[in-house]
Amino acid sequence: MAVISLLQGLSVGQQIGTAAAISVFVLTSIVVYGCYLHPLSHVPGPFLAKFSPIWGMRALYRMKFNSELQALHEKYGPVVRVAPNEVSFATLEAETAIYANQEDGRFSKAGTFLTLFSDLVLNAPTLITIPDPALHKRLHKVIQQAFTPQALASQEPIQKLHIEKAIPDFDETADKGYHIDLADKLETMFWEIIGDLAFGEPLMAGKRPTYEKLKQLGKGSMPMVEALSFMLVMPGVAPTLEMARSFLSAMPMSSQLSKLVPSTKLRDCVERKDGREDFLSAIMGSEKQGLTLDADAFFSNAMGLTLAGYQTTATTLASTFYHVLRYTDAYKTLCTEIRSAFNDEAEITGERLARLPFLNACIRETLRLLPPANGKTAQRTAPSCTIADTYIPAGTIVSADLYTIQRSPKYFVDPARFHPERWLEDAEKNGFNGDNRSASRPFLIGSRACIGRHMAQQSIRLIMATLLWRYDFELLDPDGFIWERDAGSSLIYTDYKLPVHVKRFQ
């Protein structure tokens, strides 16, 4: 109040000059503190990241987060400060330190980018974002029932059903000589699969366009969420933060989400009791662990698991086809393996596909090059500790960047190229004896590792094997779309495509 009274006694010119001087002083203080006095001032990184969220906002706005973070690590080393209160690591040792032992809650999900984004879109914490380790453990135990070997076996007929439903469209494309965006077809196919697996019936059938609108809204909000993450650790910004929260919450993301699965339809699924081991039934079993989920928590967990599982699996499915089609020798080897392993399409099963070495090598190599989770989705809030010989004060946001680690020459021979041979038994004879296979952990490790990874891999195997058994695919223009150059990356990959010619094989 005294400052305001003082300013009121000045002329307009003096008021402007004084306000400018105060602004310069405050800005200079922020810069000096961030660069020289902050507890993380010893960590190297870009100048703007030392005192502002601008580096992260810009990388997210450009949709080049993965490649730009990798470039930072190449410039500054394995430990990089990417925001005033955030550090990214690019070593296997750091990855193990952050994620391997999480049951004590020392490295928490609280305050991370993904948790904040989820809070803005959903009305309750989910298995993916819940910070309490004890609560997470109990919820994980019940939801795990949807991903047991028994559950996977029961899910296979549903996966095959939706694959078969897509076949007439591929047949027509092949017969008429059309070309298609294979990525779009694959995503639509898996959308129908996971909707059925999640809710016990095709509850989301035909609603992928609604999800795509939601995804575009989410993509546009990423820079603002990055700014909010920065503001969370600043003193005295609560009113501004709440205003920003209200603004983001007012965006139509939540309304689009409710269109995917209306609450009345969800209640019908809850009341249906047919013994199916779907995601919804698993969540309903939470009461067996003494957990009582209200309607918001129930809906949030169902949608969180479904959409996270859909996007990561659909991306890996498309990117595996992308790599196989670009590397023609790998394509020929894979087709030969699949077509010689079975006498009839009916013999194609998840159990037998899990034993095909080259198919699984192609999937593993794709996951190494393009892990579905990156630094933003894998953030943790650290305790006071030392990681990779670097002191980290309590409350710092930390992550290990899988994209950079899994493409590092420190761990892999010829790391930027697609070499499925590196995952075969005779890899050492083929020149990959310098690989450290344990450095590829695309599903993360520890208690927060991806719960649906086996379901995802089974779906990918079944779809790829069925399509390559029936059809031959060829890229329209092998250099027309380059994933690393043209796809967007933030929390997820976006804007990828796969234009192909399709021919019947038999």
UniProtKB/Swiss-Prot annotation:
E.C. code: 1.-.-.-
The name this protein goes by in its record: Cytochrome P450 monooxygenase tpcB
GO function term, MF aspect, one: oxidoreductase activity, acting on paired donors, with incorporation or reduction of molecular oxygen
Residue sites binding heme per the record: 450
GO term, biological process aspect, one: terpenoid biosynthetic process
Cofactor requirements of the protein: heme
Keyword Hydrolase appears in the UniProt entry: no
Presence of the UniProt keyword Heme in the record: yes
InterPro entries: Cyt_P450, Cyt_P450_E_grp-I, Cyt_P450_sf, Cytochrome_P450_monoxygenase
The protein's annotated pathway: Secondary metabolite biosynthesis; terpenoid biosynthesis
Annotated keywords: Heme, Iron, Metal-binding, Monooxygenase, Oxidoreductase
SUPFAM superfamilies to which the protein is assigned, alphabetical: Cytochrome P450 (SSF48264)
Family: Belongs to the cytochrome P450 family.
EC category: oxidoreductase
Organism: Cochliobolus heterostrophus (strain C5 / ATCC 48332 / race O) (Southern corn leaf blight fungus)
Function as written in the Swiss-Prot or TrEMBL entry: Cytochrome P450 monooxygenase; part of the gene cluster that mediates the biosynthesis of terpestacin. The bifunctional terpene synthase tpcA converts isopentenyl diphosphate (IPP) and dimethylallyl diphosphate (DMAPP) into the sesterterpene preterpestacin I. The C-terminal prenyltransferase (PT) domain of tpcA catalyzes formation of GFPP, whereas the N-terminal terpene cyclase (TC) domain catalyzes the cyclization of GFPP into preterpestacin I.
